[in-house]
């Protein structure tokens, strides 16, 4: 028990304060009076809807004990099915739970949110980071290959026809009709003034792992639009990602780092480029 939680018990009420950018938590309370041996169920239903929709949703919880139990069972069934594709069995139950449940759950959450809600971004980000999202796909390929394939297609459609990836893929992404870092309108809307060297190069390990896991060799022949114009097969998208790097070499003939953020000076762009060639050859 933390000191703060002890203080809440002493006060017997919450302060209704907003803790911005601190180590906060969400807390809800209710005043109830129970007779000896009596039980009750309290359901906290959280969400944001307009009045009409909210009223309809709240109407489903007139009997919270039954409704919540039913939804809990549905939730357990949902995640059990998601985790079923990969299960490890070792002499350690704790290790099994960590790998089979919590690691898998964290991979799904990262895949779904793509770091769009975090301490770093104060709960807000105006789109998907390209390499972040492509990297995060790898964590669920073995658990939900169909979800992974859909997200790969989405990220391929956020690749510009010059081979580079959009540094930020808007939540309203419209394949074939997007502005790019070459356009002042994109820079103004997203705040990203240039391409990054390695964004599209992360497609290589992700696509390769998907094909290796599923055996779906035809995937590389699927035709997908580019972000701004034109379309091409998955294989063509990968080729253009390599071309993007080849056309942007430094004075020593190695792939240049281009625009960077907080730790990009540490990334081995040339090595990533080399691995991209190797992966394309294997495909």
Located regions from the model:
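Single conserved hydrophobic/aromatic residue that forms the stacking wall/gate
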Residues: 1-9, 273, 280-283
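Acidic/polar, glycine-enriched structural segments that form the non-catalytic walls/loops
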Residues: 7-16, 22, 27-127, 227-235, ...
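Extended hydrophobic/Leu-rich segments
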Residues: 8-12, 206, 269, 273
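Aromatic-rich carbohydrate-recognition surfaces in CAZymes
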Residues: 37, 128-133, 137-148, 152-255
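Intrinsically disordered, low-complexity acidic/polar segments
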Residues: 51-55, 213, 283
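Extended glycan-interaction surfaces of carbohydrate-active proteins
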Residues: 85-127, 152-186, 242-275
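Short, flexible active-site-adjacent loop segments at beta-strand->alpha-helix junctions, enriched
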Residues: 101, 207, 280
